[in-house]
A protein has these predicted regions:
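Catalytic core of pol beta-like nucleotidyltransferases
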Residues: 1-24, 32-38, 50-98
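Acidic Asp/Glu-based divalent-cation binding sites
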Residues: 41-43
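Short hydrophobic/aromatic beta-strand micro-patches
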Residues: 45-47
Length: 98
C-alpha cells in the first residue's frame, strides 16, 4: 500500500475519524520517507478535538488496522518522546480533506 493509497482510505473513512473526535491525522515514518517494505507498519499521528478514553483509542487503532489491512502504529503529539518529536513533526504529512 502506498502513501497515496493510505490517504485515500483515510479520506474515504472520514466519518469514522470524526466519530472518534479526530481533529487531524497524518502519516510519518517509512511511508513518508519512501523506505516502506511489504511488512512495514503504518505510522499515524493523530490529534483529537478533545481527549478520548483509552478504550476508544484502542478501538480506533483496531479500526484503522482493519481499514488499511496492515499493522498501524498510532500516536499523538503529546505521546512522542522528546528526543524524536522534532523529527516526526517535521516529517508528518497531515491528510487534507478531513
Amino acid at each position: 500500500m502506498t502513501k497515496e493509497d493510505i490517504k485515500k482510505v483515510l479520506i474515504k473513512n472520514k466519518s469514522l475519524l470524526k466519530r472518534y473526535k479526530v481533529n487531524k491525522i497524518g502519516i510519518f515514518g517509512s511511508c513518508v520517507t519512501g523506505k516502506m517494505k511489504k511488512k512495514s507498519d503504518v505510522d499515524l499521528l493523530v490529534d483529537f478535538d478533545e481527549m478520548i478514553d483509552l478504550f476508544d483509542y484502542v478501538h480506533l487503532s483496531d479500526e484503522l488496522q482493519q481499514m488499511l489491512k496492515t499493522k498501524v502504529d498510532l500516536s499523538t503529539p503529546d505521546a512522542i518522546k522528546p528526543y524524536i518529536k522534532p523529527k516526526i513533526l517535521r516529517e508528518v504529512e497531515w491528510i487534507e480533506g478531513l
